[in-house]
């Protein structure tokens, strides 16, 4: 099992989004993921989730794993769900993933476990 974690100030993501708008969103979220955004906290949570997912691979966001190799969605209970691209799943021999996102006191945090 491998674990990745990321924490970010919601205000930091909010400032970047207000400055760059949809261009910022398009750099790390696909259209289905953009629909999940309800407020700055959920946007920051999505950022943290993708960063944590890349760190769980031991590589971070880079040429080996782009933001678009990681997809965040919701399950039937509205809990966050993580899916890697087929290439990442094969290259890193991933059989299971688990994602948790939380927001509190101006921060968003995400933890990813990969088996």
Swiss-Prot record:
CC cofactor: Mg(2+)
Domain of life: Bacteria
One cellular component term from this protein's GO annotations in UniProt: cytoplasm
One GO process term, biological-process aspect: fatty acid biosynthetic process
Binding-site residues for Mg(2+), renumbered to this chain: 6, 51
Function (record text): Transfers the 4'-phosphopantetheine moiety from coenzyme A to a Ser of acyl-carrier-protein.
Family classification: Belongs to the P-Pant transferase superfamily. AcpS family.
Protein name: Holo-[acyl-carrier-protein] synthase
Protein source organism: Campylobacter jejuni subsp. jejuni serotype O:2 (strain ATCC 700819 / NCTC 11168)
